Amino acid sequence: MRWPCSSWFRGLWPEAAPWAVLLALGVPGWVLAVSATVAAVVPEQHVSSAGQAPLDWLLTDRGPFHRAQEYADFMERYRQGFTTRYRIYREFARWKVNNLALERRDFFSLPLPLAPEFVRNIRLLGRRPNLQQVTENLIKKYGTHFLLSATLGGEESLTIFVDKRKLSRKSETTGGIPVVGGTGNSSAVSLETLHQLAASYFIDRESTLRRLHHIQIATGAIKVTETRTGPLGCSNYDNLDSVSSVLVQSPENKVQLLGLQVLLPEHLRERFVAAALSYITCSSEGELVCRENDCWCKCSPTFPECNCPDADIQAMEDSLLQIQDSWATHNRQFEESEEFQTLLKRLPSDRFLNSTAISQYWTMDSNLQHRYQQLGASLKVLLKKMHRIVRRLFNLCKRCHRQPRFRLPKERSLSFWWNRIQSLLYCGESTFPGTFLEQSHSCTCPYDQSSCQGPIPCALGEGPACAHCASDNSTRCGSCNPGYVLAQGLCRPEVAESLENFLGLETDLQDLELKYLLQKRDSRIEVHSIFISNDMRLGSWFDPSWRKRMLLTLKSNKYKPGLVHVMLALSLQICLTKNSTLEPVMAIYVNPFGGSHSESWFMPVNEGNFPDWERTNVDAAAQCQNWTITLGNRWKTFFETVHVYLRSRIKSLDDSSNETIYYEPLEMTDPSKNLGYMKINTLQVFGYSLPFDPDAIRDLILQLDYPYTQGSQDSALLQLIELRDRVNQLSPPGKVRLDLFSCLLRHRLKLANNEVGRIQSSLRAFNSKLPNPVEYETGKLCS
C-alpha cells in the first residue's frame, strides 16, 4: 500500500556524514509501508550462580560490540550485582522511504526540486572549479551521496535487571501466590510475578511501571529501564538527522545511496568525483592519484605526511608489541608447565648432563613432547597473525618518511631449551638464573647478580671425561678412562715415563755438525765393527770381474749387549789401477738387530729422495776415492750388520749422447787382456751407539701379566707404545714402515714369535682406547 506523507522535506541536508553513511539530500515525498510487531519476554542469563567465576574477562574492551549502548547498560548492571536480564520489546511504525524526486525526473522528465541554496552554490563554482572549491562549496555542505531508499522505524522496550540471590523465598515457604501491595513494605516477590508484570507492560503501561518501581524500592533485587526510540508516526520531519535511531538496517532493508554527481551538470561531474575521492581518501590533505593499479595521495604543502596514517601505523605497531608479549608469555607458560618442571625433577644430579644427555631424556618424555607441540601450534598462530599485520604495515608505510619499527620474535629451538635446562640446573643460585656455557663449564650471570653458579657435577664419558664421579664430592672425578690419569679431581692425558732406563734416544746430532764430522772422518762418530769377507781382503788388489761380498757386523749380543747402534753414514775407500775403465757398483743391505741375511732391508741409493754416493779423490796417483753415502738425521736407521755386494762395470762414453753406458765385463781367460784391478782400503760405518737395557724391558713386559700396583699395567703399556713408535720411526724409506720393534724383541730380547705377537696385540688393543690414537701399518721384516 502506498500513500504520501502529509509533509515535505526541504531540499538537501546541510550537514556532512562519513563515507558509506547517509549523506543527506531531502526528498519531496515518501512511500510508506507501516508494520508493528510485539516481541515476547527474552531472559538473558549471564551468571548462573554465586559460585561461578566473575565475568570480568567479558567486560574488557574487545571491539564495537562491547562499546554498544546495550552492552554498556549490561556491564553497568552486572557490576552492580545483577545476574539476569528480562527484556520485552516491540518494533513499531516501520516505513519504507523511496526518493520520488528521481522517479519524477526519470519517468516524467520533470525538473528536480533542488533547494535554491544548492543551485546557487553550483552556479558559484563556474565552468572550471578546482578540487578545493568543489570540496568547500558542495562536499563539506551537502556530502557526497543522497538517499535513494531506506526503512524508518522505532522501538520501545522494557528491561528488568534481576538479582536472583536477593529475591524473597517467602512465597515458597507459604505456598501462596505473592501479592504486591501498594502500601506493603515486606511483600514477597517471585520470578513468576516479574514475568506477569512484564507481560502486562504493553496492556497497562502506567500501572505496570508503578508496581515494578515499588518492587525495585522495596527489595533492591531488580532495576527497571524503559527505552523508546524512533519516530512515533509519520510526522513532519524537516531533516532526518534530527531523529535518533530512525534508519533500520537489516538484510531485507538496506539503505541505498547514490552519488551526488548525478544531480550536477555534466561539466562538474568528473571534478566532483575526483574531489569526493580526494576528500574521503585523503581527508582534504591532498589529491588522490592512481597509476598502474596503485593509488596514493599527492600531499599538499600543508600536510606533507598525508600518505602516512600515523594512528593506524601506531595501532599496528602496538599490536605487534602485544603479540611479542603474548609470544613471551607462551614461552614462560611452557617453562612453568607441569610437564617441563617434571622433567627437571627427574634429571639425575650425581653427574653432569650435556646437551646430548638432556636431549635423550627430552625425547623419552611423551607428555613433554605433547606440551611442546602445543607451544609450537600457539606460536604458529601468533606468527601468522604477525606476518599479516606486518604486510599491512608495510603497505601503509610504503610512502612514509618514517619506516615502521618492529622486531619479529624467533621460535626457540630444541637446543635452546636443552641449554635452558642446563642453566636452571647449574646456574640457578640467584633470583634470576644465568646462562650456562657448556664449552667452558661456567655460567654467565645477570648483570645485577654477583654469582649464580651452583655446584657442577663431573662429566662422565669417553676420553678426558670421568669414568665415575667421586662419592664424597660429585664435582670431582673419582676415576678416569684408560689413557688418562686423575690429577686434582680432573682427568689429564697420561704421558709415558722417560725411556732413558730402557733405550736412550736423545743423542741426535745436527745436520751441519754431522757433515763437518764426516768431512773430517772424525773417529768419535765411527762405530767400530768387524769386517768379514771370503772373497777379498782389505788393502789387497783383486780382480773385480766377479761379484764380491763383504759385511761389517757388530755382534752386539756377544760383545755389546747393552748397546744398539744407529747408522748415519757409510764410507768406502776404493782404489783403481791407472787407465782402468772399471766402475764399482755396490748394493747395500742393512740388518737392524741381527738375525739372518733375509731379515735385512735393501738401501735404495739415489731412488726418490734417498741420497746418492758422494765421491772425493784421495790419491791421484793410485786413483783412490772415498765413496760416502750420508743418511743424516732424516734417513738414519738402526743397524747390526751391513752387507755390501760389489760388482764392476765398464765405463764408456757414447759420442752421440751425454749418457754413461755400463757393460758387464766379459770373462777373461787371458790375464794380459785384464781391464784393471781394484782395492778397498777401508769400509767404515759412522753413527753412534745408544744405551740399551734388555732386562729392564723384560721387566716392563712382565708387568703386562703381573702388574706391581694398580695402574702399573697401563703405565707399562704406555711406555712400550712409546718405545715401539720411536723405534719404528727409524724405519727405512718405503710405502709401508718396517716393524723394527718386533726385530728388537725377537733378536735382542730373544723372545719367541708367539710372545712377540701377543705383545703387539696388547699394544694395539690398548692404543685403540687412548685419546686420538695414531695407528699405522707396518711391514714384517723379521721372522
UniProtKB/Swiss-Prot annotation:
<keyword id="KW-0732">Signal</keyword>
<dbReference type="GO" id="GO:0045930">
    <property type="term" value="P:negative regulation of mitotic cell cycle"/>
</dbReference>
<dbReference type="GO" id="GO:0005576">
    <property type="term" value="C:extracellular region"/>
</dbReference>
<feature type="domain" description="MACPF">
    <location>
        <begin position="85"/>
        <end position="281"/>
    </location>
</feature>
<dbReference type="InterPro" id="IPR033237">
    <property type="entry name" value="BRINP"/>
</dbReference>
<dbReference type="InterPro" id="IPR020864">
    <property type="entry name" value="MACPF"/>
</dbReference>
<comment type="function">
    <text>Inhibits neuronal cell proliferation by negative regulation of the cell cycle transition.</text>
</comment>
<dbReference type="GO" id="GO:0035264">
    <property type="term" value="P:multicellular organism growth"/>
</dbReference>
<feature type="glycosylation site" description="N-linked (GlcNAc...) asparagine">
    <location>
        <position position="658"/>
    </location>
</feature>
<feature type="signal peptide">
    <location>
        <begin position="1"/>
        <end position="33"/>
    </location>
</feature>
<dbReference type="Pfam" id="PF01823">
    <property type="entry name" value="MACPF"/>
</dbReference>
<keyword id="KW-0338">Growth arrest</keyword>
<feature type="glycosylation site" description="N-linked (GlcNAc...) asparagine">
    <location>
        <position position="185"/>
    </location>
</feature>
<dbReference type="GO" id="GO:0045666">
    <property type="term" value="P:positive regulation of neuron differentiation"/>
</dbReference>
<keyword id="KW-0131">Cell cycle</keyword>
<dbReference type="GO" id="GO:0040011">
    <property type="term" value="P:locomotion"/>
</dbReference>
<keyword id="KW-0325">Glycoprotein</keyword>
<dbReference type="GO" id="GO:0043025">
    <property type="term" value="C:neuronal cell body"/>
</dbReference>
<dbReference type="GO" id="GO:0007399">
    <property type="term" value="P:nervous system development"/>
</dbReference>
<protein>
    <recommendedName>
        <fullName>BMP/retinoic acid-inducible neural-specific protein 2</fullName>
    </recommendedName>
</protein>
<feature type="glycosylation site" description="N-linked (GlcNAc...) asparagine">
    <location>
        <position position="354"/>
    </location>
</feature>
<feature type="glycosylation site" description="N-linked (GlcNAc...) asparagine">
    <location>
        <position position="579"/>
    </location>
</feature>
<dbReference type="Pfam" id="PF25415">
    <property type="entry name" value="EGF_BRNP1-3"/>
</dbReference>
<dbReference type="GO" id="GO:0071300">
    <property type="term" value="P:cellular response to retinoic acid"/>
</dbReference>
<keyword id="KW-0964">Secreted</keyword>
<dbReference type="GO" id="GO:0030425">
    <property type="term" value="C:dendrite"/>
</dbReference>
<dbReference type="Pfam" id="PF19052">
    <property type="entry name" value="BRINP"/>
</dbReference>
<feature type="glycosylation site" description="N-linked (GlcNAc...) asparagine">
    <location>
        <position position="473"/>
    </location>
</feature>
<comment type="similarity">
    <text>Belongs to the BRINP family.</text>
</comment>
<feature type="glycosylation site" description="N-linked (GlcNAc...) asparagine">
    <location>
        <position position="626"/>
    </location>
</feature>
<dbReference type="GO" id="GO:0021953">
    <property type="term" value="P:central nervous system neuron differentiation"/>
</dbReference>
